[in-house]
Amino acid sequence: MSTNMREMLEAGVHFGHQTRFWDPKMAPYIFGHRNRIHIINLEKSLPMFQEAMKFAKQLTANRGTILMVGTKRTARETVAAEAQRAGIPYVDQRWLGGMLTNFKTVKTSIKRLKEMKAQQEAGLDSISKKEQLTFKREIEKLEKDIGGIQDMTALPDAIFVIDVGFHKIAILEAKKLGIPLIGVVDTNHSPLGIDYVIPGNDDSSKAVALYARGIADAVIEGRASAMDDVVKAVSAEGSDEFVEVENAAA
């Protein structure tokens, strides 16, 4: 879960957007500018990223679920891979309006997808070729739209968003429901309303990979921590029982 300044530099986390596009609310996190490009202060970004990872780890250790969101072309593949590695839900293609605020309807679509997948595994020989084609097109669309959240049985306990400006609808829905937000915020967007701000480049594929990997690692560590606690609790109970039996025999 550790990330250092050198890794951030190599990933280009410090490169912001052109100065003319900046959001003044990001001023506290900007070091300066070079060739009309804002330079993000990594001495601010690093501890804030570490704080976000710490939150992700603690949330997961307490059985919480984090939804990872990154639908830009530079983020899709990485988001899907890292979320799958960490075993958490994700959105990598497009954010459907109401994905959170109308989750009841989304759950109906998830149920439909699972039923269709089961039907596909059982075989489609009983329906015509034309019906098979229609069936496959529907299942492909559902996989694309909600495939990453098909195992999400309830609203997430937090959302990690790469590029808050690109995912405004997701941000608004999370705020409306009071779901904590971890967000990568570049110099051209406002950090207001984001609970755990990560000031940084939101376009570089290397930077995106660093953020996604860090949060995924935090989730994995949090889950391992929770498992350790369970093992310790079970071991302690077993130890107590053993002592009682031994004393009784004496």
UniProtKB/Swiss-Prot annotation:
Record-annotated membrane-spanning stretches: none
GO cellular component: cytosolic small ribosomal subunit
The keyword Ribosomal protein appears for this protein: yes
Protein's GO biological process: translation
Origin superkingdom: Bacteria
Keyword Cell inner membrane attributed: no
One MF annotation (Gene Ontology) recorded for this entry: structural constituent of ribosome
UniProt keyword terms in alphabetical order: Ribonucleoprotein, Ribosomal protein
PROSITE patterns: RIBOSOMAL_S2_1
InterPro entries for the chain: Ribosomal_uS2, Ribosomal_uS2_bac/mit/plastid, Ribosomal_uS2_CS, Ribosomal_uS2_flav_dom_sf
A Pfam family: Ribosomal_S2
Family: Belongs to the universal ribosomal protein uS2 family.
Name of the protein: Small ribosomal subunit protein uS2
Source organism of the structure: Polaromonas naphthalenivorans (strain CJ2)
Name of the gene encoding the protein in the UniProt record: rpsB
